[in-house]
Amino acid sequence: MIQPQTHLNVADNSGARELMCIRIIGASNRRYARIGDVIVAVIKEAIPNTPLERSEVIRAVVVRTCKELKRDNGMIIRYDDNAAVIIDQEGNPKGTRIFGAIARELRQKFAKIVSLAPEVL
């Protein structure tokens, strides 16, 4: 469960390393974001000489959470870290590579992210 002030790792090669959630997109007063939700975040740590800079406000989609995700068939998926992929206004990823496993629940809304992922669980 991602809420405002939560720090997340960046799971792509866009140039940012760490994000902090500011807001959850989708409802006026939603408290938590889960896998597949879009958040507004600020870059807390960035790689030098990249297009993204520290303290820049961006949008990202949550791809991994420590809080378990329960599927309809009873399977439970839990990751070791909270991670997000930076996206533009159209929902396309800014990076060209995705690091780590991605949940199958992203397939409907974010097909481009799933196609770049090395492993889909």
From Swiss-Prot:
One of its GO terms (cellular component) is chloroplast. Belongs to the universal ribosomal protein uL14 family. SMART domains: Ribosomal_L14. This is Large ribosomal subunit protein uL14c. Pfam families: Ribosomal_L14. Coiled coil: none annotated. Component of the chloroplast ribosome (chloro-ribosome), a dedicated translation machinery responsible for the synthesis of chloroplast genome-encoded proteins, including proteins of the transcription and translation machinery and components of the photosynthetic apparatus. Component of the chloroplast large ribosomal subunit (LSU). Mature 70S chloroplast ribosomes of higher plants consist of a small (30S) and a large (50S) subunit. The 30S small subunit contains 1 molecule of ribosomal RNA (16S rRNA) and 24 different proteins. The 50S large subunit contains 3 rRNA molecules (23S, 5S and 4.5S rRNA) and 33 different proteins. Keywords: Chloroplast, Plastid, Ribonucleoprotein, Ribosomal protein, RNA-binding, rRNA-binding. The keyword Amino-acid biosynthesis does not apply. Its main location: plastid. GO terms for biological process: translation. CDD domains: Ribosomal_uL14. GO terms for molecular function: large ribosomal subunit rRNA binding; structural constituent of ribosome. It comes from Spinacia oleracea (Spinach). Signal peptide: none annotated. It comes from the Eukaryota. It is found in: Plastid, Chloroplast. InterPro entries: Ribosomal_uL14, Ribosomal_uL14_bac-type, Ribosomal_uL14_CS, Ribosomal_uL14_sf.
